[in-house]
């Protein structure tokens, strides 16, 4: 018997193929039946739709706020357990400002609101920000897995929504009235909306010359890059009532399709 496996897990897709073929003969009078058994995995396919413009931070002044909306839909065949958000950046320009550090510029921006389940229902919407979290720490935690930044974020974002990978889960969890809508299931049909509010800190501190300390950021600009990773539920011991007549595991389209500990 030969067996090959190929497993590919990515931000929004998964594929697993395994085929088993068996057959044999015996004696002069026999009846040979050959069956091919094919096991094919489902797919994780997350559609992230941005409901507002790209997040370009330029020509802003201290005190300004901007709002970003995201919508997630499940275009795959497996229920999505988490949608993990990571932050990166690109295209930083000093533009004549005395500050030349993109991370220092990120530290001037705070996430003041991160609303999960904005569409409502099942105990949501819920703001998971406990205290203002700056973009520098979110970047260092999610992109660099920085331990110090992670410790700070634990006090600023509801720990239930923090993943061990250093990313923030922005999908609904622990629904109060309809747990079948936790995550982003395929069945029943669902979508999740997330709203984020970012504010340019208004620091009134002045230096010894009487100049605002934030003057060094004048002219700076940066582009924020958000990425979203869909994850599956844990493994499930398949029972007869989990499949249809063709062997399709319909149970895996649902939230909480995993063995209970």
From Swiss-Prot:
<dbReference type="GO" id="GO:0042802">
    <property type="term" value="F:identical protein binding"/>
</dbReference>
<keyword id="KW-0732">Signal</keyword>
<feature type="signal peptide">
    <location>
        <begin position="1"/>
        <end position="27"/>
    </location>
</feature>
<dbReference type="Pfam" id="PF12389">
    <property type="entry name" value="Peptidase_M73"/>
</dbReference>
<dbReference type="InterPro" id="IPR023833">
    <property type="entry name" value="Signal_pept_SipW-depend-type"/>
</dbReference>
<protein>
    <recommendedName>
        <fullName>Major biofilm matrix component</fullName>
    </recommendedName>
</protein>
<comment type="similarity">
    <text>Belongs to the peptidase M73 family.</text>
</comment>
<keyword id="KW-0964">Secreted</keyword>
<comment type="function">
    <text>TasA is the major protein component of the biofilm extracellular matrix. It forms amyloid fibers that bind cells together in the biofilm. Exhibits an antibacterial activity against a variety of Gram-positive and Gram-negative bacteria. In laboratory strains, is also involved in proper spore coat assembly.</text>
</comment>
<feature type="region of interest" description="Disordered">
    <location>
        <begin position="241"/>
        <end position="261"/>
    </location>
</feature>
<keyword id="KW-0749">Sporulation</keyword>
<dbReference type="GO" id="GO:0030435">
    <property type="term" value="P:sporulation resulting in formation of a cellular spore"/>
</dbReference>
<dbReference type="GO" id="GO:0005576">
    <property type="term" value="C:extracellular region"/>
</dbReference>
<dbReference type="InterPro" id="IPR022121">
    <property type="entry name" value="Peptidase_M73_camelysin"/>
</dbReference>
<comment type="subunit">
    <text>Forms fibers. Fibers have variable length and are 10-15 nm width. Interacts with obg (AC P20964) in pull-down experiments.</text>
</comment>
């Amino acid at each position: 018997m030969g067996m090959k496996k190929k497993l590919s897990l990515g931000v929004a897709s998964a594929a697993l193929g395994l085929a088993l073929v068996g057959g044999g003969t015996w004696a002069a009078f026999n009846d040979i039946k050959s069956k091919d058994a094919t096991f094919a995995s489902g797919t994780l396919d997350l559609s992230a739709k941005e409901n507002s413009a790209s997040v370009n931070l330029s020509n802003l002044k201290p005190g300004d706020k901007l709002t970003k909306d995201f919508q997630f839909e499940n275009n795959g065949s497996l229920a999505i357990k988490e949608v993990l958000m990571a932050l990166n950046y690109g295209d930083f320009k000093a533009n004549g400002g005395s500050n030349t550090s993109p991370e220092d510029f990120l530290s001037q921006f705070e996430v003041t609101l991160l609303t999960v389940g904005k569409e409502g229902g099942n105990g949501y919407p819920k703001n998971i920000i406990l205290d203002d979290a700056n973009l520098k720490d979110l970047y260092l935690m999610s992109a660099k897995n920085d331990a110090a930044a992670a410790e700070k974020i634990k006090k600023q974002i509801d720990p239930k929504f923090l993943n061990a990978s250093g990313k923030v889960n922005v999908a609904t969890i622990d629904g109060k009235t309809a747990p079948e809508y936790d995550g982003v299931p395929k069945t029943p049909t669902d979508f999740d909306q997330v709203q984020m509010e970012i504010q340019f800190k208004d620091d009134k501190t002045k230096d010894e010359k009487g100049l605002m300390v934030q003057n060094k950021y004048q002219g700076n600009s940066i582009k924020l890059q958000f990425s979203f990773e869909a994850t599956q539920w844990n493994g499930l011991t398949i029972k007869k009532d989990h499949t249809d007549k063709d062997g399709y595991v319909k149970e895996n389209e649902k939230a909480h399709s995993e063995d209970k500990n």
